[in-house]
Design a protein with these regions (language model features):
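Oxyanion-binding "anion nests"
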Residues: 1-31
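Short, surface-exposed loop/turn motifs that are enriched in glycine and acidic residues
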Residues: 2-6, 33-44
Length: 125
């Protein structure tokens, strides 16, 4: 079963890399980013984490995915306020909402920290 799930992970990673916005974020609607054009940091954090983890574990080629990870990480760091608050986090709900820079949730911060832990490991290589 391991190889089966690894193949799914690689396919999902490739698709997600192609859906990254020009601004570095993944938006609330992956297939129609214009419907929710504002940044979305919780998804971006989780995706950056997943891709960086794959690079660190040797599952994903760094030459292909490192530029995507760096662009996503740069986007995430732009969303951190001077007081440390992470903004642009989609609220819990049944469907996407328009978000603003001052909107945050704990899981957004968690996603940021998970991404940071893998970025740190990348920087150590």
């Amino acid at each position: 079963t391991g190889p089966f799930y690894l193949e799914i992970y690689k396919e999902m990673s490739e698709r997600l890399a192609g859906l990254q916005g020009k601004d570095g974020y993944w938006h609330a609607s992956l297939l129609d980013p214009d419907s929710y054009p504002s940044p979305e940091t919780s998804a971006t954090g989780f995706i950056v984490y997943g891709l960086a983890y794959g690079i660190n574990q040797g599952y994903l080629p760094a030459d292909k995915y490192l530029p995507v990870v760096k662009k996503g990480w740069e986007a995430l760091t732009r969303a951190v306020e001077t007081n440390g608050k992470l903004g642009w986090v989609q609220p819990v709900g049944a469907d996407p909402k328009k978000v603003t820079r001052d909107m945050t949730e704990l899981y957004g911060t968690g996603a940021f920290l998970m991404a940071a832990s893998e970025i740190y490991k990348l920087a150590d290589k």
